[in-house]
From Swiss-Prot:
Gene3D superfamilies (UniProt xref): Aspartate Aminotransferase, domain 1, Type I PLP-dependent aspartate aminotransferase-like (Major domain)
Descriptive protein name: Phosphoserine aminotransferase 1, chloroplastic
Gene Ontology, cellular component aspect: chloroplast; chloroplast stroma; plastid
Annotated positions binding pyridoxal 5'-phosphate: A145, T146, W171, T221, D241, Q264, N306, T307
Organism annotation: Arabidopsis thaliana
Keywords in alphabetical order: Acetylation, Amino-acid biosynthesis, Aminotransferase, Chloroplast, Plastid, Pyridoxal phosphate, Serine biosynthesis, Transferase, Transit peptide
GO BP: any one term: L-serine biosynthetic process
Keyword Chaperone included in the entry's annotation: no
Top-level enzyme category: transferase
Location relative to the cell: Plastid, Chloroplast
Lineage: Eukaryota, Viridiplantae, Streptophyta, Embryophyta, Tracheophyta
PTM annotation (N-acetylvaline): residues: V52
Length: 430
């Protein structure tokens, strides 16, 4: 029958969506002829659009189907990055009407009971995942880890305090440059001269005796360098940017004064920044600290001082729930180790056709940079991989080559397909 003002389109979760009545016969309108099919009728010709529901499931990291009629790619992007398909499907099912509330999460008041239940559960699940002690606060903020490069010294230092930095890549270097505006900085080790391919021996670090804290980037996304253990500050406390390996493995939170990171690599979409901070470190911000960078303001207001990134926090909550359902971070780490071993072994077994410049002992489980012996073939490698539905393999513009980011949500099947492609490519071009 033709759609009228009393007609409804029925979604895959039986949600009724009112169909609009055209203002005149010259405008396009809708006919519902077959189940799940919408005919767009105009003066020219009808166009039928078939809406296909899918029950795609991912078991043991392997896809059992595709969403709708459009097969998904394997997305190796460094961030924003691939998200778990079951999380996306949950969000899709609730997008129009969240749990019978009559509204989308994107429409909720951040001070309403519905969103309060979302953010409180997200924090609770994250605390369970990382076994966060009660003497730590969890903040859901905005601005990315880059904003925290300023927020950290503003909240934790006086202008004449010194902060030590171990710089193992581009992000650690950026953190130093920003901190210089608000405190004294001392780079006690930098891997820049060796093109950021290693982590130093902690015994050789000459720390500043009265340093307020020691800052590291736990996993350098661009260069693929990851701390497998952490230095112990002689004075002060340890602060870590964990943007690209957050929730990829268990972490002893009590070893840190602050852990922070952007969500868009491992635990959600872009727009959410998570800060885990020891409570006794809150409340000492410099007078010049903007209100939106003051940890005390956000802590006292439970991350609701202003409108937070509501939908992003909701998505993070779904990811935390998913990680718990997988068995927690010990199980997640096992899966990540298996994927990384598969890819690194393929590189090592290529007899130099593929090369990873990073020292083996500190190679990242999350970001795998590699180059070709014949660099002139790299563009073709990226192009041909895209044809096989493996995308975002181009290395960061500052280093070139290729990079495969294999975060939690990258299924084993994606890495297996990439390794098979690498072997075929080598056979054709060796």
């Amino acid at each position: 029958m033709a759609a009228t003002t009393n007609s409804f389109l029925v979604g895959s979760n039986n949600t009724q969506i009112p169909a609009l009545k055209p203002k005149s016969s010259s405008q396009s309108f809708l006919h519902l002829s077959k189940p799940n099919t919408v005919n767009f009728v105009s003066k020219t010709k009808p166009v039928a659009v078939r809406c296909v529901a899918s029950t795609t499931q991912v078991q043991d990291g392997v896809r059992s189907g595709s969403v709708g009629s459009q097969e998904r790619v394997f997305n190796f992007a460094a961030g924003p990055a691939t998200l778990p398909e079951n999380v996306l499907l949950k969000a899709q099912a609730d997008l129009y009407n969240w749990r019978g509330s009559g509204m989308s999460v994107m429409e909720m008041s951040h001070r309403g009971k519905e969103f309060l239940s979302i953010i409180q559960k997200a924090e609770s699940d994250l605390r369970q995942l990382l076994e966060i002690p009660q003497e730590y606060s969890v903040l859901f903020l905005q601005g990315g880890a880059t904003t925290q490069f300023a927020a950290l010294p503003l909240n934790l230092c006086k202008s004449d305090d010194t902060v030590d930095f171990v710089v193992t890549g581009s992000w650690g270097d950026k953190a130093v440059k920003e901190a210089k505006k608000y405190c004294k900085t001392n780079v006690i080790w930098s891997g820049k001269s060796e093109k950021y391919t290693k982590v130093p021996s902690f015994e050789e670090l000459e720390q500043t005796p009265d340093a307020k804290y020691l800052h590291i980037c736990a996993n350098e996304t661009i260069h693929g360098v990851e701390f497998k253990d952490y230095p112990v500050p002689k004075n002060g406390f340890l602060v870590a940017d964990m943007s690209s390996n957050f929730c990829s493995k268990p972490v002893d939170v009590s070893k840190f004064g602050v852990i922070y990171g952007g969500a868009q690599k491992n635990v959600g979409p872009s727009g959410v920044t998570i800060v885990i901070i020891r409570k006794d470190l809150i409340g000492n911000a410099q007078d010049i600290t903007p209100v939106m960078l003051d940890y005390k303001i956000h802590d006292e207001n439970s991350s609701l001082y202003n409108t937070p990134p509501c939908f992003g926090i909701y998505m993070c909550g779904l990811v935390f729930e998913d990680l718990l359902e997988q068995g927690g971070l010990k199980e997640v780490e096992k899966k990540n180790q298996r994927k990384a071993d598969l890819l690194y072994n393929a590189i090592e077994e290529s007899n130099g056709f593929f090369r990873c410049p990073v020292e083996k002992s500190v190679r990242s489980l999350m970001n795998v940079p590699f180059t070709l012996e014949k660099s002139e073939l790299e563009a073709e490698f990226i192009k041909e991989a895209a044809k096989e539905k493996m995308v975002q393999l181009k290395g960061h513009r500052s280093v070139g080559g290729m990079r495969a980011s294999i975060y939690n949500a990258m299924p084993l099947a994606g890495v297996e397909k990439l390794v098979a492609f690498m072997k075929d490519f080598q056979a054709k071009h060796a």
